[in-house]
Design a protein with these regions (language model features):
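ATP-dependent NMP and nucleoside kinases share a basic, alpha-helical "lid"
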Residues: 70, 74-77, 93-152, 158
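Conserved beta-strand scaffold positions in the cores of enzyme catalytic domains, especially
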Residues: 61, 127-131, 176-178
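Conserved lysine of the Walker
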Residues: 41
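Small-molecule kinase domains that catalyze NTP-dependent phosphoryl transfer to phosphate-bearing small molecules
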Residues: 133, 141-192, 200-206
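Extreme N-terminal, non-catalytic leader segments
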Residues: 1-30
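The conserved Walker
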Residues: 37
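Conserved substrate/cofactor phosphate-moiety recognition/catalytic segment
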Residues: 46-94, 98
Length: 206
């Protein structure tokens, strides 16, 4: 466990963010997508990354499944572990954004307090909160990963939306963008997402 006595920050000696953004010719940003399993957030995150990459934007995708097999492999799904999961992800996302990288995070992130914590860690100016809204019934019908069937059979515990609550943004204005994948297709959702992200990653003209 770290303590103030054995930590010696060297932030003043580090290469500044502006220099890194100038090299990449872009602004760092964290695009934080969240929603139920099966809502389409990972599909949109991947599609957004490919589109930005095709335009020469340097990106990094942080996805729930990948993070939990590496960085957060020691965490479960208790309330405390869910909070630590999001805290670590937000800290990593902040590091990427500070390096000028457009960081796309895709996680269930089920509670308002967790999203507020992530926004606080990253910083308001660098955080774009995107709620991928989709009804439980539609997500259960899609069941892309077979998790809803396993949860129904009791094979998956603490499953969000069934055993563990998912909180929509409250107030709804807490989310910077809401994409309703019940009502619109992937193409329309991606276009809305891209239009929200693109202006925020462009460097101001000198």
């Amino acid at each position: 466990m770290s303590s103030p006595e054995n930590i010696h920050p060297t932030f003043g000696q580090l290469l500044g963010r502006e220099a890194k953004e100038a090299l990449l010719k872009q602004r760092g940003l964290v695009v934080w997508l969240y929603g139920l399993s099966g809502s389409g957030k990972s599909t949109l995150a991947n599609a957004l990354e490919r589109r930005l990459h095709g335009e020469g934007v340097f990106t990094q995708l942080l996805d729930g499944d990948n993070i939990r097999t590496g960085l957060n492999s020691n965490l479960g799904f208790s309330d405390d572990d869910r909070q630590e999961n999001i805290r670590r992800i937000a800290e990593v996302a902040k590091l990427f954004a500070d390096a000028g990288v457009v960081t796309i995070a895709s996680f269930i992130c089920p509670r308002n307090e967790l999203r507020a914590m992530a926004r606080g860690i990253v910083g308001q100016a660098d955080f774009l909160e995107v709620y991928v809204e989709c009804s439980f019934e539609t997500c259960e019908r899609r069941d892309v990963k077979g998790l809803y069937a396993k949860a129904k059979a009791g094979e998956v515990k603490q499953f969000t939306g069934r055993d563990s609550a998912f909180e929509p943004p409250e107030p709804r204005e807490a989310a910077d963008l809401i994409l309703n994948t019940d009502e619109q297709g992937e193409g329309e959702s991606l276009e809305q997402l891209y239009r929200a992200v693109n202006p925020r990653v462009a460097l101001p003209q000198a």
